[in-house]
Amino acid sequence: MDLRPIGIFDSGVGGLTVLKRLVEVLPGEDYIYFGDTKRVPYGDRSEEEIKKFAKQILNFMREQKVKAVVIACNTTCAVINKSEYDVVLFDVLKAGAESAALYTINKKIGVIATTRTVESKSYEKNIKIIDKNIEVYQKACPEFVPLIEKGLYNSPIAYETASKCLKELKEKDIDTLVLGCTHYPLMASVIEEIMGENVKIVDPAIKLAYDVKDYLLKKDLLNPQIRGKAEFFVSGDKDNFIKTAEMLLGEKIENVLHVDIEKY
């Protein structure tokens, strides 16, 4: 038994899609969520900047006395060295690669992600560790995150933008598409409509949530309470964050606190 909370962080609202899955699988846990809304998006930032941001956020999480941290940001997962940190870390990118390799039948997988994640080739590397015969086609969709952060994920402009970005992958005969950024599940209905029913859309957060549960069970670290709570911290704008959080989690969000993350 361990009553400490689980930490989750992302560049903005995207990680809320991961929090939603975690609450579904582990409703008794308490959660500390940090959204770096001041510095979003991460996708076009340098590797050095992202590493610095991750260090600051993990220092903040350590101060919150969390028992584990879920990195709900594929871009961060793609560039940091997890072994440098003395906290248990769960990697959304690794979970996505494992899920995609499991689902594909024709061994043709598409990955949409931020520019930085695509350039790192982290998905391709992780998928090919599992099965070197799988073909991986990656496409950067940098326009998605700004739209989602503004709450425009189901708008006509979202459909138009997604159609342009996905055109190349539609021509590759993929049967599996990884949403390689935790913001992208907010556009899942748009993406599914464009790709068609024959393409399996993979949300890495589903497997990730079960990975966390398996770890807590194995280490006897589960919180025994029936229903936990979530606390939210942001570095910048609260308004769109609260709106998206309430829509995703289906409840009123009042405890969103501002934190000066750069002091960490």
Swiss-Prot record:
Pfam families reported for this sequence: Asp_Glu_race
UniProt GO BP: cell wall organization; peptidoglycan biosynthetic process; regulation of cell shape
EC code(s) of this entry: 5.1.1.3
Disulphide bridges: none
Pathway: Cell wall biogenesis; peptidoglycan biosynthesis
Active site: C73 (proton donor/acceptor), C181 (proton donor/acceptor)
Keyword vocabulary terms for this entry: Cell shape, Cell wall biogenesis/degradation, Isomerase, Peptidoglycan synthesis
Catalytic reaction list: L-glutamate = D-glutamate
Superkingdom per UniProt: Bacteria
HAMAP family recorded: Glu_racemase (MF_00258)
Cross-referenced PROSITE patterns: ASP_GLU_RACEMASE_2
Function: Provides the (R)-glutamate required for cell wall biosynthesis.
GO molecular function: glutamate racemase activity
Annotated positions binding substrate: D10, S11, Y42, G43, N74, T75, T182, H183
Family: Belongs to the aspartate/glutamate racemases family.
Protein name, per record: Glutamate racemase
PANTHER family (UniProt xref): GLUTAMATE RACEMASE
Keyword presence, rRNA processing: no
InterPro entries membership: Asp/Glu/hydantoin_racemase, Asp/Glu_race, Asp/Glu_racemase_AS_2, Glu_race
